[in-house]
């Protein structure tokens, strides 16, 4: 998953917050959706040790740390990790951060986590079943027996039927009234894989400016991901759709056997 995916998130690290209408509110809202699941499965928030294995600039890690969880973050993008460090420091949050690909989570020295999370469709970046299965195995090794894995992924069971070519656009404005437009264009490569072009166009004092990045994803269906997690040693794998969880994407949960 490294290489071009890393470059995509390195380049996006300075702009990532702009894909949200209000990043601070999104951090709080996503933490509020995830916290009850984690507490129900693992216990008291302040005693739960979490690894966010695709933390990016910290959207979930920062929100959960602020909610009292003990959070360690890892990501394949060194620039995203550096941004997360800056954001954690600005909020006086104790967030341990590591540069680590999901295929090489041994770069994170700690083990025995109560929970590992992997949000924002990160699992879809794996281009083949073999790499996705290896990532699941790496994640299992980071968990204590009985620990929980929680991941979010797009609803590809639905999207694979429609094969959309655009997501959005979304129109936002900041506190100063400056507008921005965020959307994705999807170019389908084959039945499962697509290149997505992310556009963030901002109204600046010197005119409109656009950030454009390209990466690839693979549509992984729910039964496929369930089978891979079970093959990696997870038990009681189950799904929570947004109507149940309050999270913006479907969630998959599995207990480390």
Report residues per predicted region.
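Class I SAM-dependent methyltransferase SAM/SAH-binding core
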Residues: 59-105
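A short acidic, Gly/Pro-enriched loop at the edge of an enzyme's catalytic core
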Residues: 107-115
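A short glycine-rich, Lys/Arg-flanked "PGG" loop and its adjoining helix->strand segment in the class I
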Residues: 133-145
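SAM-dependent methyltransferase
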Residues: 150-226
């Amino acid at each position: 998953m490294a290489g071009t995916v890393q470059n995509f998130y390195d380049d996006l690290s300075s702009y990532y917050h702009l894909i949200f209408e209000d990043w601070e509110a999104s951090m709080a809202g996503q933490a509020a959706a995830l916290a009850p699941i984690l507490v129900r499965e693992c216990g008291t928030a302040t005693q739960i040790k979490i690894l966010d294995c695709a933390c990016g600039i910290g959207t979930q890690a920062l929100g959960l740390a602020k909610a009292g969880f003990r959070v360690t973050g890892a990501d394949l993008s060194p620039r995203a990790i550096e941004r997360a460090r800056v954001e954690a420091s600005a909020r006086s949050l104790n967030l341990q951060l590591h540069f680590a690909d999901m295929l090489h989570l041994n770069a994170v020295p700690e083990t025995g986590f109560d929970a590992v999370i992997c949000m924002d469709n990160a699992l879809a970046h794996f281009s083949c079943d073999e790499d996705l299965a290896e990532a699941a195995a790496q994640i299992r090794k980071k968990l204590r027996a009985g620990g929980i894995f929680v991941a979010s992924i797009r609803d590809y069971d639905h999207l694979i039927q429609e094969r959309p070519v655009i997501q959005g656009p979304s129109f936002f404005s900041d506190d100063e009234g400056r507008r921005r437009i965020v959307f994705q264009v999807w170019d389908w490569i084959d039945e499962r894989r697509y290149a997505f072009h992310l556009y963030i166009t901002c109204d600046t004092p010197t005119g409109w400016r656009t950030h454009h990045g390209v990466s690839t994803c693979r549509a992984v269906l729910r039964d496929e991901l369930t089978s891979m997690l079970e093959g990696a040693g997870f038990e009681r794998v189950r799904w929570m759709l947004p109507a149940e969880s309050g999270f913006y994407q479907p969630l998959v949960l599995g207990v480390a056997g």
